[in-house]
Amino acid sequence: MLIGFSVVSFGQMSNKKPVEKTVSLGLKGGVNVPRMLYFQNEALSQLPQAFTVTPTGGLFVDIPVGEAVVLAPEVMYVQRGTDMSYEHRSGAQVHYTMLASYVDLRLPLEFRCPVSNYFQPFLVIGAEGGMRLFGQIHMDRTEPIAMDETIDVGDANLALIHAGALAGVGVRSRVNIGASYILLKLSVTAHQGLLDSYAQGEKDGTSAPLNVNAYQITGYRLPQGLEACLSIGIPLKAGQDDACATFSKDRYHRHSNRGHLFGF
């Protein structure tokens, strides 16, 4: 994908134009690899977590705020959770999964390296805040204490609000189409939650969700993610400058032809 993206980008270099400081609006989509960081809980932090790929997508706005800086706020759908297997002290084999859907508001800042107008690597850092929508927790285990149960996530077993930070790298390009262009961005970002995702009810004992039966809740459970996304945007003022330039040239040619026709 990156090779194809680069070929399209460099193909545009033969028709260079000044970089327009134009706001763009578009769609962003890709995949996310969610997991959990168990902090101050040595037992859980040592358990392996399965590699899980989930879809993610949303809307973004690309707002240039300087020669090499872009503010790119976005609203995204993303899934967070974990998938782990371990052996209980009783000898039972336990499989525990949690996958919850969120809607995020993110405020990334992109710092571009202007290699050319049509191929610009960038670094991105930013903040994100999200709200839990829905999801499920599933646990199954073998004898001698066999069980297989699935419950919905809620206030009793998963915090409602998510807040975190993100950082990553990417490349951006402009693909000219007539008098306008399409903005393309390919990015890979790491996401780190900063708020504990354990619900207060399950930590203070006022609720007894499936989590309590799976393990002793201590420390903090912080969501993490690794996203790879493609963004496609269109300018909100497409081709206005080119239209003015074309109108001016047309007037010049008409006046020039009239002068030759009438001799002045």
Task: State each model region's role.
Residues R35-T52, Q79-Y102, G130-H162, D196-T206, ...:
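Extracellular/periplasm-exposed beta-strand and loop segments of Gram-negative cell-envelope proteins
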Residues F10-G58, G233-G239, G259-F264:
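Short glycine/proline- and aromatic-enriched beta-strand/turn motifs that initiate or cap beta-hairpins
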Residues G11-Q12, L59, R106-R112, L166-S173, ...:
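Short, well-ordered amphipathic alpha-helices
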Residues Q120, N157-H162, A167, R172-F264:
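Predominantly the C-terminal beta-signal and adjacent terminal strand-loop region
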Residues V69, M76-T82, A100, R112-F122, ...:
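Acidic/histidine-enriched, beta-strand-rich ligand/metal-binding domains
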Residues V23-G29, L71-P73, V103-L105, P121-G129, ...:
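Transmembrane beta-strands of outer-membrane beta-barrel proteins
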Residues L2-F10:
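Hydrophobic h-region of N-terminal signal peptides that target proteins for export
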Residues V19, V33, I63-E67, F111-N117, ...:
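Outer-membrane beta-barrel strand-turn architecture
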